[in-house]
């Protein structure tokens, strides 16, 4: 992972492989999932994307008429990066694109539970503080839910439509271990239940799983010499089986009205997630992504609180960061997870762990928690 800065990929230099082309007349558009000043992401049905006669729910990123050349280039760059990266369970994978005969459309996996930040906030009231003595109760709770299962859905390659009143049980530990070995979550393991997923509780095991999955996704990006630059809970999507997927909705994010993006020079930047070297020297590296991952962990274990609560981004904030101010442990973080956060926030970028090392550290914590 320690790669010379000159080797980071330059999206503008990547080729676009036309094998991804998909006929735009086979897309049927639905509701808007996210929108910004220049772009939006829309839910759509793609006909014949995987199998010749099958319909599949997808997410389609596109530009608005207000977009400029810069935004058009940015969308094309994102398409090239996704094409270059290839598939990984913990990134939002490319499924196709429309680049001829009309505006550019980027077709990706649809993640039915939306972004992780809002998911965490919705689950706050039902969070189960799974201290050791609570584990039996949590296991019983999950087993009771799973005993209410009805018939299995046999679709292994396509998304299942999420209709009101039908939902899917969180996988058991055995399911999760099995899916990790396989390398992707097999949907026949996810069974419809009487209780909707929205009513299923969140526990420490889930938070550790999200931490682990995002670290795996980031290790994959690093192995491909790719820097994310905007890692945060709002940029992680969640799908069936509580699988997390890293995305970048840059064009579809309303950064003008999102207080997380602070005007700095000519740009709006997510300052509270940025490493000091990124804030003060505009340097972005794997190590600065690791800093952002530490902030993401803080969001995760605070169940979606905003970092540096009550602190506006002003000259005092910049001074405190320069002087080494760091956040205290969030409410639900085990001591070992807070230790990881603190190492991610080392002032010396080279003393921060790599994502590969973070994966190993969280693996130990997950095993201990089981």
Curated annotation (Swiss-Prot):
InterPro entries per record: Kinase-like_dom_sf, Prot_kinase_dom, Protein_kinase_ATP_BS, RTK, Ser-Thr/Tyr_kinase_cat_dom, Tyr_kinase_AS, Tyr_kinase_cat_dom, Tyr_kinase_rcpt_3_CS
Listed PROSITE patterns: PROTEIN_KINASE_ATP, PROTEIN_KINASE_DOM, PROTEIN_KINASE_TYR, RECEPTOR_TYR_KIN_III
Keywords assigned by UniProt, alphabetized: ATP-binding, Kinase, Nucleotide-binding, Oncogene, Phosphoprotein, Transferase, Tyrosine-protein kinase
Domain writeup: Lacks the transmembrane and extracellular domains.
Location of the Protein kinase domain: 27-370
GO annotation, cellular component aspect: plasma membrane; receptor complex
Keyword Transcription regulation: no
Superkingdom of source: Viruses
One Pfam family from the record: PK_Tyr_Ser-Thr
Entry binding sites for ATP: 33-41, 61
Protein name as annotated: Tyrosine-protein kinase transforming protein kit
EC number: 2.7.10.1
GO molecular function: ATP binding; growth factor binding; transmembrane receptor protein tyrosine kinase activity
Nucleotide-binding keyword on record: yes
Similarity section: Belongs to the protein kinase superfamily. Tyr protein kinase family. CSF-1/PDGF receptor subfamily.
GO biological process: Kit signaling pathway; positive regulation of cell migration; positive regulation of receptor signaling pathway via JAK-STAT
Record's catalysed reaction(s): L-tyrosyl-[protein] + ATP = O-phospho-L-tyrosyl-[protein] + ADP + H(+)
Other comments on record: This protein is synthesized as a Gag-Kit-Pol polyprotein.
Active site: 230
Top-tier EC class: transferase
Residue numbers bearing the Phosphotyrosine modification: 261
């Amino acid at each position: 992972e320690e790669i010379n800065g000159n080797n980071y990929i330059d999206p503008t230099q990547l080729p676009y492989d036309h094998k991804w082309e998909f006929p735009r007349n086979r897309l049927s558009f639905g509701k808007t999932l996210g929108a910004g000043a220049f772009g939006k992401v829309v839910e759509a049905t793609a006909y014949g994307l995987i199998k010749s006669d099958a319909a599949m729910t997808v997410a389609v990123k596109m530009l608005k008429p207000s977009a400029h050349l810069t935004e058009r280039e940015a969308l094309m760059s994102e398409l090239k990066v996704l094409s270059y990266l290839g598939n990984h369970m913990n990134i939002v994978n490319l499924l196709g694109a429309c680049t001829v005969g009309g505006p550019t459309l980027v077709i990706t996996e649809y993640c039915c539970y939306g972004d992780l930040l809002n998911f965490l906030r919705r689950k706050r009231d039902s969070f189960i503080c799974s201290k050791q003595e609570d584990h039996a109760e949590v296991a019983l709770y999950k087993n009771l839910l799973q005993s209410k299962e009805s018939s299995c859905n046999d679709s292994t390659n396509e998304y299942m439509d999420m209709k009101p009143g039908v939902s899917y049980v969180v996988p058991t530990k055995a399911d999760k271990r099995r899916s990790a070995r396989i390398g992707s979550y097999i949907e026949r393991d996810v069974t419809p239940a009487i209780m909707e997923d929205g009513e299923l509780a969140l526990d420490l095991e889930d938070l550790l799983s999200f931490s682990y999955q995002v670290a795996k996704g980031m290790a994959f990006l690093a192995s491909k010499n790719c820097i994310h630059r905007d890692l945060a809970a709002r940029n992680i999507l969640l799908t069936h089986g509580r699988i997390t997927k890293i995305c970048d909705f840059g064009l579809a994010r309303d950064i003008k009205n999102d207080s997380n993006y602070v005007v700095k020079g000519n740009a709006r930047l997510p300052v509270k997630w940025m490493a000091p070297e990124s804030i003060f020297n505009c340097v972005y590296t794997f190590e600065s992504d690791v800093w952002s991952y530490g902030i993401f962990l803080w969001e995760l274990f605070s169940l979606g609180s905003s970092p540096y609560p009550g602190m506006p981004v002003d000259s005092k904030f910049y001074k405190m960061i320069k002087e080494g101010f760091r956040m205290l442990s969030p409410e639900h973080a085990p001591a070992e997870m807070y230790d990881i956060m603190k190492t991610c926030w080392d002032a010396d970028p080279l003393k921060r762990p790599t994502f590969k090392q973070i994966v190993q550290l969280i693996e130990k914590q997950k095993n201990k928690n089981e």
